[in-house]
Amino acid sequence: MEVTRFAPSPTGHLHLGGARTALFSYLFAKANKGKFLLRFEDTDRERSKKEYIDSIIDSLKWMKITPDEEPVYQSKKTSNHKEIALKLYEEGFAYACDCSEEQLSEMRKDQISKKQKPMYNGLNRDKNIKFSEGMVLRFKFPLHNSSAFDDLILGKISVENKEFDDFIILRSDGTPTYNFSAAIDDIDMKITTVIRGDDHITNTLKQINVFKVLDKKIPNYAHLPMVLGESGKRLSKRDGAEDILEYRHKGYLNDALINYLVRLGWSYEEEEIFSLEKLEGIFDLSHVNSSPSKYSQDLLNWYNNKYLNFLTSDELIFKLKEDFKVDFGELERGDSAISLIAKGANTLKEISEESKYFFQDPLINLESSGIGIDKKEIFMDFKNQLNEIDFQQEEIESVIGIFLKLHNL
C-alpha cells in the first residue's frame, strides 16, 4: 500500500509551494488507494510555534486535505532518534567528533582560500574517539563512488560521494538533526513515496545512506520543481507566496485554489477543470512537469471566477454571508443581484465590495459640488422621483425622459 506524508516545519504559515506539495502527496496516496500522513518536523525549539501548527492544520482542512491518521510530532520522538544514533555509533557507522567552533572555522577559511568547497574534512573520522557529553556524532558518509536514486519526476539523479561531508546526526546538546530524524521517521511511518520540493535533493541523497546502513527499504522519491513568481524569480509574498488562509480572506474558493494548484506543473489530457473527487481518482506523477511552474494571478482569478459561477445563487448568498457578513437574502431579488455581480467578479470579496449599492443609498454631496441652489433642487427632485418608482427598466427610462424634457436637458 502506498503511504505518503507531508512534513512541514511549523516555523511559519503554510504557503503556496507547501500547499501544492501537500496536495500532490495527498492526491497520489488517494489515487493509489493508500494513506496520506501528516508529520510536523518541530525540532527547531526556538522557531517552532503552536500557532503555526494550528495555522497549517486549518489551511489543510480548508483545502480538504485530510490526513488518515493523527499528526506525528517529531519532537516527541527525540529519544528514539537519539537511541538509534548511538546504535550507529556503536556499530561503526557514526563517530564522535570533538572539534571546536574555532577549529571548524579555521577549516572553512583554509578551504575557501584554496578555492575548495567548505565542508567537514573528516579530521576525527578514524580516531575512534570515545563519545561523551558535549560531543557531536557524525555519520560516516561513503568515501567512494556515488549516491544515486531514480526520481519519479526528474529521472536518475547521481552525485559523487566526495561532494558530501560526514554530516552531524546528533548535536552537542544531544538533539538529533533534521536529515537523520526525517529518515528514521519515514521508516517508522512506513512511508513508501516521498513527494517534496527539489530543494530537498541533497537531503534525499543523505537520507538514503541512512536507510542503507539501517538495512531498511528506501522509499521512492519524487521532487517537485519549484514554483516561480510572475517575474520568473523565486516566488515571493508579492506574487503569491503568502499564507494559504489569506486566499480565503481575500475571497477565493477552496475548490478553485485546489484546481489552480494542481495545474501548477501537472496536466491531464486537454482538461482544465477538475473536482477534488476526480483528482483523487486520476492523479499520477507521470504527468508532472520536470520544469519549474510559474505563478499567475490572472489564471488564479480565472479559475475563481469559474468556480464562483458554478455555485447556485443560494450557495453564493451563504458563502458571502459566512465570510463577509453580507446578506443578499435580505434583498427582494437578492438571488438575481448576486448572480449578476458574480459573472464579472474574481472573488467573493469583489462581490462584497460591489454589493454596497444594494444595501445603502449613494452619498451625494451637493454642497461641495459647486452646483447652484436652483440646480440642487432639480437634482433632489429627480432623486425623490426615482425613490418612489418600481425599479424596472421601462419606468426608469420614462422618469428620466420626462425629467430631461421638463428641464430642457
Where are these regions (language model features)?
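N-terminal Rossmann-like or analogous alpha/beta NTP/dinucleotide-binding catalytic cores
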Residues: 1-113, 203-216
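A short glycine/serine-rich beta->alpha loop
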Residues: 8-14, 194, 402-407
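Short capping/connector residues at structural and topological boundaries
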Residues: 11, 19, 45, 77, ...
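Glycine-centered flexibility sites
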Residues: 12, 17-18, 33-34, 64, ...
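Conserved nucleotide- and phosphate/pyrophosphate-binding catalytic cores
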Residues: 50, 54, 64, 184, ...
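Conserved S/T- and glycine-rich ATP-binding loop of Class I adenylate-forming
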Residues: 88, 139, 300
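Active-site cores that bind ATP or allylic diphosphates and position pyrophosphate for catalysis
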Residues: 95-223, 228-237, 243, 268, ...
